[in-house]
Structures are given as structure tokens and as C-alpha cells.
Amino acid sequence: MPSGCHSSPPSGLRGDMASLVPLSPYLSPTVLLLVSCDLGFVRADRPPSPVNVTVTHLRANSATVSWDVPEGNIVIGYSISQQRQNGPGQRVIREVNTTTRACALWGLAEDSDYTVQVRSIGLRGESPPGPRVHFRTLKGSDRLPSNSSSPGDITVEGLDGERPLQTGEVVIIVVVLLMWAAVIGLFCRQYDIIKDNDSNNNPKEKGKGPEQSPQGRPVGTRQKKSPSINTIDV
């Protein structure tokens, strides 16, 4: 075959290529549209990121992180990313089937800087990470007041050790105390009545002897009478 000549493809192959040429401009946009729609649905099903992320109850080796979730969203868990700055110590805490809005961070190094990020877990995946929060643990020499809780007393909920009583609790306590006072007062009253009755009955029983008749005979003894016979003459 001469070098300047080129062989042409078969007629059947030319037809197939011609049929694919009109589709090539539309194939890429269609695929991109489907992928973007799929990603849009997935993002719509994910919960929003947590808000109001704060770190409290700082100790030398522990802390408590808490957050809020926007209303109207189904959240079944959380995921916390903990990172120590200027050193190793990355940790991820993940928990599902819970509605808690706080978590205790333990095993921290004293006098060290950390950052945390919280994600919400929904039915279709995790939310984007929340705002990055920085905190620093206390030194070992920084002691807490004697009336405060120890580091081991930190709860998952992050509640304070001393909580003021609510109005309903105070009312219940007062009602219970009044009921007990009424029961004790009623018992004391009944006891006094029984004691007075016993003291009044004892002197009468001691001074009471067998009753006697005016003739000196006991009243209880009946005199023997002779039978009387009545005769009627007709």
C-alpha cells in the first residue's frame, strides 16, 4: 500500500461512529446533572451543623463540651473530633441512638491546648463540622475549691453538682412534711385520750366493792320466800 494512502473504516463501523457523534455533546452534561441532583438530595437529608458549641468544667485532665441542635431536625447521635495542638493526641468520639447534647472529654494533658469540632449524626449521614472551639486545660497545681466536685464527678450531661430546687419540688417537700406533722399530731391526740380514759377508770374500779342491802345483806342474794296458797270457796 502506498505510504500516502490511508484505509477507510468499514461501512458498518462508520454508521456506529456517526450515531455516537450526536450524543457526545449531551452525555457529559447529563451525567453531571444526575450527579449534582444526587448530591443535592444527600445534602438535604443531612442534619445541620451543631451551634453554640462551648467547653466548660475545665480541669487538669478533663473538660465538658456541650452544643445545641437547630429545632425541626432529626438527630440520632454526635461525633466529636478532638485534636491536641503542638503534639499528638487526636481522638474521635462517636455515639449514636442518643439525644444528649454534652460529652465529657477525659485523658487530657494538663496545661495543654486543644480544639474540638462537633458533628450531628442523622438518618442519612453526618452534618458538616461545627465551629472549631479552642480551650486550654488547667495546671496540676490549680486546685478547685473544697466544695466543688472532683474531676471524676464530671457527668456526660455536664450538669453542676449543686442545682437549686424547682418550685414543684419545694411544694412536694412541704406537702409531705405537713402530712407527717398531721399524722404525728393525730397520734399524740389519740394517745392522750386513751391515757385519760385509763386514768379515769382505775379509781372507780378500786373504790367499787360488792353492793349491800340496807339490812347489810348483799343485794345480789335473793331472800328465800315460802310458797303462798290461795283457797277460793265456791
Swiss-Prot record:
Residues 189-234 are cytoplasmic. Glycans are attached at N52, N97, N147. Residues 45-167 are extracellular. The keyword Glycoprotein applies. One of its GO terms (cellular component) is plasma membrane. Highly expressed in the liver and the brain, including in the cortex, hypothalamus and hippocampus. Also expressed in adipose tissue. CDD domains: FN3. Residues 197-209 have a biased composition (Basic and acidic residues). Induction: Up-regulated by inflammation in the intestine. Up-regulated by TGFB1 in a colorectal adenocarcinoma cell line. Residues 1-44 form the signal peptide. Gene3D superfamilies: Immunoglobulins. Residues 47-140 form the Fibronectin type-III domain. Keywords: Glycoprotein, Membrane, Secreted, Signal, Transmembrane, Transmembrane helix. Residues 122-160, 197-234 are annotated as: Disordered. It comes from the Eukaryota. GO terms for biological process: negative regulation of inflammatory response; response to transforming growth factor beta. The chain crosses the membrane at residues 168-188. This is Fibronectin type III domain-containing protein 4. It comes from Homo sapiens. The gene is FNDC4.
